[in-house]
């Protein structure tokens, strides 16, 4: 199963995340199928490749709870359903 989850990167205590499509059996920082965006929790900065995310969701990818809340803030699910 394909999951949309956060991949950790950055320096210690200055962590950022990439939003990636990855096989659910892979490690958190394993090789992703596709990088779909960026999230920095310190500044609350988010950059998303919305068309690619919508495509992955329509293919059946399941977002984790954290990624789901990021996508809800960006109103990505409205584009999937409508």
Curated annotation (Swiss-Prot):
Record's protein name: Small ribosomal subunit protein bS16
Sorted alphabetically, which HAMAP family does this protein's record hold? Ribosomal_bS16
A GO CC term assigned to this protein in UniProt: cytoplasm
Q: What is the lineage of its organism?
A: Bacteria, Bacillati, Cyanobacteriota, Cyanophyceae, Oscillatoriophycideae
- What GO molecular function annotations does the UniProt record carry, in alphabetical order? structural constituent of ribosome
Q: Which family does it belong to?
A: Belongs to the bacterial ribosomal protein bS16 family.
Q: Which organism is it from?
A: Crocosphaera subtropica (strain ATCC 51142 / BH68) (Cyanothece sp. (strain ATCC 51142))
The alphabetized UniProt keywords are: Ribonucleoprotein, Ribosomal protein
Keyword Ribosomal protein among record annotations: yes
**Entry's SUPFAM superfamilies?**
Ribosomal protein S16 (SSF54565)
Tell me which InterPro entries the record gives. Ribosomal_bS16 (IPR000307), Ribosomal_bS16_dom_sf (IPR023803)
The biological processes this protein is annotated with in GO are: translation
- A Pfam family this protein belongs to? Ribosomal_S16
What's the gene? rpsP
């Amino acid at each position: 199963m394909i999951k949309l989850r956060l991949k950790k990167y950055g320096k210690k205590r200055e962590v950022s995340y990439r939003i990636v499509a990855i096989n659910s059996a892979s490690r958190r920082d394993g090789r992703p199928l596709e990088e779909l965006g960026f999230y920095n929790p310190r500044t609350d900065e988010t950059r998303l490749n919305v068309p690619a995310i919508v495509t992955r969701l329509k293919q059946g990818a399941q977002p984790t709870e954290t990624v789901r809340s990021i996508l809800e803030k960006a109103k990505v699910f409205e584009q999937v359903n409508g």
